[in-house]
Amino acid sequence: MKEITTLEELNKFREEHANVLVDFWAPWCGPCKMVIPLLEGLQEEMTDIAFCKVNIDEAADVATHFGIRNIPTLMHFPNKEDVSGKTQIGFVSKPKLIKWLTS
């Protein structure tokens, strides 16, 4: 999963990929650590989605830009025209995450 450290980097990543999932996380966050292997597995299965992650401790400005207040927070941008994305906060099971991503 690509590590994003700046807003410019995230914007470029979104320009390069039509369907993007962003994982806002922190290394000290227990639920965030539970989400990582789940997302890594989904990345292998759902190849139409480009996965990236933002460490909120290292890229606080990116988190602030998107109004991230809780972690883990996942933002899904299913197309390039979607500027706000849809948000999933907290840990969810794989079936619920797949349903969220495909709905």
Name each region found by the language model.
Residues 60, 66-77:
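Structural micro-motif
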Residues 76-103:
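Non-catalytic, surface beta->alpha helical segment in thiol-disulfide oxidoreductase systems
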Residues 12-13, 62-65, 100:
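CheY-like receiver
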Residues 28-35:
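Short, thiol/selenol-centered motifs that function as redox-active sites or metal-ligating centers
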Residues 4-6, 24, 36-61:
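Thiol-based oxidoreductase modules, predominantly thioredoxin-like and allied folds used
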Residues 23-25, 76:
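Structural cue for short, hydrophobic secondary-structure segments
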Residues 2-20, 60:
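A short beta-strand-turn-helix
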Residues 18, 25-28, 70:
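Short pre-active-site segment immediately N-terminal to redox-active cysteine/selenocysteine motifs
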